[in-house]
Amino acid sequence: MAVVVFDSDVLIGFLNPADAHHTEAVALVRESLAPATRRMLSAVNYSEILIGPIKAGKDARDHVEAMLGHFSIEIMIVDMALARRAAAIRARTDLKLPDAYALATAIHAEHNGHDDVRLASFDKAVLRAHAELHPN
């Protein structure tokens, strides 16, 4: 089964039509809807996408949560293994911790038997770190 792990920037771009990456984000989300594809988001990255909507009010937050449910995006709970992996990535790279969690979630999925894992991110540093730390 294929897996798409979202970095928060893709879903923020998807939700905000004024975002510079909106069109590309919509395309990435649509591509992730292919049959037999799981969609994942780290709980840390979930909190990132909620910040703006929480500031905007309950309706905006509810809109985000409805979108996640509509597209069956699984929120991956941060357990000790994922936290250790994110910390190791953070220690070895210049990535900020939330970005390390996006990458750690993708690598975690790969280590748990998923052989077709894609990390959806607009952050070149995240994608570069993924290629360096976990080349396919």
Residue ranges and their predicted role:
Residues 6, 41, 77, 97-100, ...:
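Short beta-strand scaffold positions
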Residues 17, 71-92:
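Acidic catalytic patch
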Residues 1-3, 103-136:
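Acidic, PIN/NYN-like endoribonuclease modules and their adjacent C-terminal/linker elements
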Residues 1-40, 53-66, 115:
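Short, well-structured N-terminal submotif of metal-dependent ribonuclease cores
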Residues 10, 45, 82, 102, ...:
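Alpha-helix capping/helix-boundary segments
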Residues 1-2, 55, 61-76, 127-136:
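Extended low-complexity acidic/polar segments
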Residues 14, 75, 119:
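Conserved SAM-binding loop
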